[in-house]
Amino acid sequence: MAKDLQVTTSKVNDNQTQLTVKVPVEQIQNKVEGRIRNVAKTAKIDGFRKGKVPVSHIRAQYGAGIQQEVINDVIRDTVFEAIKAEDVRAVGMPNIDDVKLEDEFLVYQATVEIFPEIKVEGMSDIEVERHTATITDEDVDTMIENLRKQRQEFAEKEGAADEGDQVTFDFEGSIDGEKFEGGSAEDFKLVLGSGQMIPGFEDGIKGLAAGEEKTIDVTFPEDYQAENLAGKEAQFKINVKKVEEAKLPEINDEFLELFGVKEGGVEQLKTDVRKNMTREIKNAARNQVKQAAFDALLEKNEFDVPSAMVDQEVDRQRNLMMQRFAQQFGGNANSIDKDMLPRELFEEQAIRAARLGVLVSRVIEENDLKVDQERVETFIKETAENYEDPQEVIEYYTNDAQQRANIESVVLEDQVVDFLLEQGKVTDKEVGYQELLASQQQGMM
């Protein structure tokens, strides 16, 4: 810590601490004088040769500004030393105020938000429902049918559009007779039953054939993302140009080769599909029970988190969504207007994530949990199995310290889940494959 730095702390509230920092005024004066002399050596001022400007002239003309610069630098250099010296677990940047230059000290106050000091309660009272699933032959057949649908092609048909058909049409929307932005399109393609449009839109198209027109009445949902449209009644004029029905590919050698099956025919495809589904439900089951355990832990521990932690989590979630948008639609994530993703979209989940982060950290500290390196190695190997060259992936995670640290963090979080399940009451429930996947997704929302 800087020489002769004096620090006292006082609690503002459960999430804030205030530090009063005193820096000997001699340190300020010495820095100011040193900087004035340096300026005098290089200053170009009319009437003086370069380097010959009297120090007294620099002090008189620039001294106040130089002193303020030095004070700002000293505060910046000492505030984090003070935080560290007082063992304050700060989150976010400190807020500096009440800066005073007294006869003996530069005095300032730094208010910082702090990591919540809580004791985890109710672990033995946690009740968790753990979902398990067994993959049936019917599940495998359904998955293969879905693989066929993913590669389906559409062929033009005569007659009315029905569920599963792809319809190409123009539409023009209006509210109270006035067109609105984004309410019109030409040659729009829609697979009926996809749920892509607002309620009532697809139903209005069913039964129409190519060349037919219709005006349909719909109501935008109350929670529609465009607030200016939410809850509004609208009319859409539809002009159907083409109706196509789906044609599923046959399960032949060509289809099998798409999935790397060169020998063994359909039975080998079923074996491979079952293997992938087994891995999928293993991950889904783990995620479901993790979310259930964390939800139960959050319910037993009510506390507020610093706004800085929530802000950081909002930024993290927003950046992830921007990256997903860029990957899905092309372009650079940095080019996406953040105003399109307002804070309100993320705040509820951000608060939950921040609170959960505190609880997980406290469970680890209170129970002295250490990362299990054997589990880390197993995690790396299982991850590597999904790649073409597993050994290369293993070496990557083994040799890259940051990547290994990320995996250790994931594994340690899994160990926290195991610890919670050991402390609480767990009830197993057998569910179907699709239900397990759905319960996992619900928990992640």
From Swiss-Prot:
Outline the extent of the PPIase FKBP-type domain.
164-249
Q: Which UniProt keywords apply?
A: Cell cycle, Cell division, Chaperone, Cytoplasm, Isomerase, Rotamase
Q: Which Gene Ontology BP annotations are present?
A: 'de novo' cotranslational protein folding; cell division; chaperone-mediated protein folding; protein transport; protein unfolding
Name any GO cellular component annotation.
cytoplasm
Q: What is its EC number?
A: 5.2.1.8
This protein's record includes keyword Nucleotidyltransferase? no
> InterPro entries annotated for this entry?
PPIase_dom_sf, PPIase_FKBP_dom, Trig_fac, Trigger_fac_C, Trigger_fac_C_sf, Trigger_fac_ribosome-bd_bac, Trigger_fac_ribosome-bd_sf, Trigger_fact/SurA_dom_sf
Q: Which GO terms describe its molecular function?
A: peptidyl-prolyl cis-trans isomerase activity; protein folding chaperone; ribosome binding
Report the locations given in the UniProt record. Answer: Cytoplasm
Q: Which Pfam families match?
A: FKBP_C (PF00254), Trigger_C (PF05698), Trigger_N (PF05697)
Q: Which reaction does it catalyse?
A: [protein]-peptidylproline (omega=180) = [protein]-peptidylproline (omega=0)
The record's PANTHER family line, in alphabetical order, gives:
TRIGGER FACTOR CHAPERONE AND PEPTIDYL-PROLYL CIS/TRANS ISOMERASE, TRIGGER FACTOR-LIKE PROTEIN TIG, CHLOROPLASTIC
**This protein's domain notes:** Consists of 3 domains; the N-terminus binds the ribosome, the middle domain has PPIase activity, while the C-terminus has intrinsic chaperone activity on its own.
Q: Which family does it belong to?
A: Belongs to the FKBP-type PPIase family. Tig subfamily.
Q: What does this protein do?
A: Involved in protein export. Acts as a chaperone by maintaining the newly synthesized protein in an open conformation. Functions as a peptidyl-prolyl cis-trans isomerase.
Name of the protein in question: Trigger factor
What organism does this protein naturally occur in?
Psychrobacter sp. (strain PRwf-1)
Gene field: tig
